Amino acid sequence: MLIVKRFILWVLLFFMAITQLLLYLPDFSCSISTGLPLCTPQFNVNIVTGSRTTKDFVSSVRQFLRLISYLAIDMGWSKYLADPHIYNEENLVDTFDTDNLFKINYFGFCKKTSGKTKYCVANGDCGMDVLGILVRDVGLQLGRLTQRYENNTRILGDSLVFTYHLGLSSMRKFLRNDNYRNNAFSKLLLATDDQPYSNTRIKNYAKGVTVAYTLVVVNKIMFYMHLAEITISAAFVVAVLGFGFVLIFGKHHTIMPLLLKGWGSVLMVSSTSSYLATIVYLGTLKLLEPTEMLDTQSQVAGHVLNNDTHSNNWDLLQTTVGSGFVISCFRYIVQCLMLPLVFIAANRYTKAKDFLPAGTEELIKV
């Protein structure tokens, strides 16, 4: 009976520890298409063209993707070369179509079109980098068009992502160095008859490159932070199990309660950092959304949207919170409630002399 009472608090702690660990499982969804392709995304993203800059950009990218799709077919890369329907619009690379929905998680993403999931794939250590995901989607679709990579489309997807990262780094260095030359080369590439508008375009494209590069770096950091958090969570469960094992041999201990408090504190710091980083990242993606209120006010006031300063922003994405983020919030609440229980259990089963100041034990004996 005494042993049963001893384990009541530990059972509650173990239940909460296992619960918070199991709540990490949805983070691994959205990464495979085989079997049952479950997906509980942190957020959902679709392409929008809310400004003149993004309209020009998306239109140019669509034309380029159409060109390389035709190129892949005409050069005999496609096994469907004899099929005349291969040239239909729905068979070409459609990454930047506005009816696509990308469901993004920590370790992978799913692409959904017209309400149907087309595929789910792992995203490596790129994490939730939205622009990198769009590049990977281009590679995956080209891989399906080409006969050489039809059985392993990820090869071309990985290659394009690697090329994208290299190109982004090179473009960032180019724009940074060109800034010291008064944007001489940038003006040659992006110049128009309207010189003030040309300078604005240069600044906007430089801003776009900076945002894209920042997304790459931040998401790599967030990926490894989250991986470390899951590892710490598993280690904490092991510590709880070890704590329960030593309780069999006695009620009061020294080392295991300290380990329990240590792992619990580290887990809380790690989960808080990861949780806040995800919130900040979602907030950053919200900045890439079009501000419909400003657009409406401009139209009501009789202004032409193309002449508005807001129309030059990178309003490229529309982001909504996914079910995976809701699960993450619930997991974080469980961890916050679990931390006080960790310290209560550890202090309850710690040897009494560990709490006494030096010399107190001798006074008690006297």
From Swiss-Prot:
Q: What is its main location?
A: membrane
Q: How does it sit in the membrane?
A: Multi-pass membrane protein
In terms of domain of life, where is this protein from?
Answer: Eukaryota
Q: Which UniProt keywords apply?
A: Membrane, Sporulation, Transmembrane, Transmembrane helix
- Ranges per topology, Lumenal: 28-229, 283-324
Q: Where are the transmembrane segments?
A: 7-27, 230-250, 262-282, 325-345
Does the UniProt entry include the keyword Transmembrane? yes
Q: Where in the cell is it found?
A: Prospore membrane
Q: Which family does it belong to?
A: Belongs to the SMA2 family.
Tell me the protein's name.
Spore membrane assembly protein 2
From which source organism is this entry? Candida glabrata (strain ATCC 2001 / BCRC 20586 / JCM 3761 / NBRC 0622 / NRRL Y-65 / CBS 138)
